[in-house]
Amino acid sequence: MTTPGKENFRLKSYKNKSLNPDEMRRRREEEGLQLRKQKREEQLFKRRNVATAEEETEEEVMSDGGFHEAQINNMEMAPGGVITSDMIEMIFSNSPEQQLSATQKFRKLLSKEPNPPIDEVISTPGVVARFVEFLKRKENCTLQFESAWVLTNIASGNSLQTRIVIQAGAVPIFIELLSSEFEDVQEQAVWALGNIAGDSTMCRDYVLDCNILPPLLQLFSKQNRLTMTRNAVWALSNLCRGKSPPPEFAKVSPCLNVLSWLLFVSDTDVLADACWALSYLSDGPNDKIQAVIDAGVCRRLVELLMHNDYKVVSPALRAVGNIVTGDDVQTQVILNCSALQSLLHLLSSPKESIKKEACWTISNITAGNRAQIQTVIDANIFPALISILQTAEFRTRKEAAWAITNATSGGSAEQIKYLVELGCIKPLCDLLTVMDSKIVQVALNGLENILRLGEQEAKRNGTGINPYCALIEEAYGLDKIEFLQSHENQEIYQKAFDLIEHYFGTEDEDSSIAPQVDLSQQQYIFQQCEAPMEGFQL
């Protein structure tokens, strides 16, 4: 989104009227967003708490009231499952010792199995409600902790399983437990709430409506063990996550101050989740972007682009990329933090998704004003972009094409000539054969901007010859543009027709240039016709 003033300025100053400013500054494209829409490996939205072997051994030695886990197998099973009738009897007994022992058995079942029997647990009448009841036992913090662990692992399951925990009334009690005097109980409550918030936007909003944020943020005000901080910032990121719809900004924006100092924690997991939270908060209208900027996080986010762990770099880059979708002033804040050198470094990343996001970020900078385009030129970024345009994976080439076309749309004559001298014409022509209609349009728009400049030069120097027509012909661009006159997309064939008519005259179409289709590469193949070796006969 752009401010009205900026939009009017762009519509007047950009040579290319077919790409409007909102198109040029792209928050997210609707198609082809594998990276942005897939579940990231770097960040789990739900986590199951699994005891270590050491913890299990310690518990078995210290627990004198219950059976060892191995003995569960020898006990009488309830019909059809792993839950024993003794476990059910014990959990509903009035003995605190038996309640604790049975709860631990349930917890072990839900922690150690590759496929924990969550459905069996939640279908056992009254069991989930009983665990929620145990959460209220302030006089027995161990029972609170074990019950919270059981419910955490139930909530780590699917949406239906998570909903059972919510319907049992666990969320308000978990939020109360964030203020428990026992750190184990606090941490397990954070974990459970993170799982519930991570299930869906509906669950996230319910947890926010239960007023989780004040006690959750209060946790960060004291010295915590590292696992507590990790769980708390992960839960915080889940509360900020989601786009359909996003969380109510007023309910999550109070966490910005905490996130700003979490960016200086050395732990990689904490840094990654803090950056993810900021990337979610900055993904939206300019007022949200401004709130993130006002939190003072931009310089640190740019510094984290050079972190040695991709788990941190990916969300930091996403947050920086979101901020530069704002207006020119907001984009300038990132540029003033020396972001371009870091982005140039990321363009040579061996990780394709990082290269792609860096190109996307740069494309939103080149959608800015001419001074901002010049900073990209001065940072020597365009040679790398043109190389990517020729050699990278297609999804990355698409983002590089946007970056170059945006620069031809808003750039000065000198800036466009610089891009031509770097060799941008041939890779733009190569994109005219791809199956992706949007990128064909982007390439056509870039070439049109270049041709328009050439026409102005021809008039100015009096030659009447557009110097860029020949360069496009040499790159077999004219053949491809002619073929696009029969494209199924109306905007593409109209644009191709207009370019041929306006810049290349009305030559007869040569049927020999009709291309074959290479479906494996998602593009058309043109034969490159060459003059005979002996030359033309006079």
UniProtKB/Swiss-Prot annotation:
Classification via Gene3D superfamilies: Importin-alpha, importin-beta-binding domain, Leucine-rich Repeat Variant
Region called Binding to RAG1, residue ranges: 245-437
Region (NLS binding site (minor)): 318-406
Repeat positions for ARM: 77-117, 118-161, 162-206, 207-245, 246-290, 291-330, 331-372, 373-412, 413-457, 460-504
Localisation: Cytoplasm; Nucleus
SMART domains the UniProt entry points to: ARM
Expression sites (tissue/organ): Widely expressed.
Residue interval(s) of motif Nuclear localization signal: 42-51
Domain IBB: 1-57
A single MF term (Gene Ontology): nuclear import signal receptor activity
Keywords associated with the record: Acetylation, Cytoplasm, Nucleus, Phosphoprotein, Protein transport, Repeat, Transport, Ubl conjugation
Entry domain remark: Consists of an N-terminal hydrophilic region, a hydrophobic central region composed of 10 repeats, and a short hydrophilic C-terminus. The N-terminal hydrophilic region contains the importin beta binding domain (IBB domain), which is sufficient for binding importin beta and essential for nuclear protein import. The IBB domain is thought to act as an intrasteric autoregulatory sequence by interacting with the internal autoinhibitory NLS. Binding of KPNB1 probably overlaps the internal NLS and contributes to a high affinity for cytoplasmic NLS-containing cargo substrates. After dissociation of the importin/substrate complex in the nucleus the internal autohibitory NLS contributes to a low affinity for nuclear NLS-containing proteins.
PANTHER family xrefs: IMPORTIN ALPHA
Protein name: Importin subunit alpha-5
Species of the source: Bos taurus (Bovine)
Gene, per the UniProt record: KPNA1
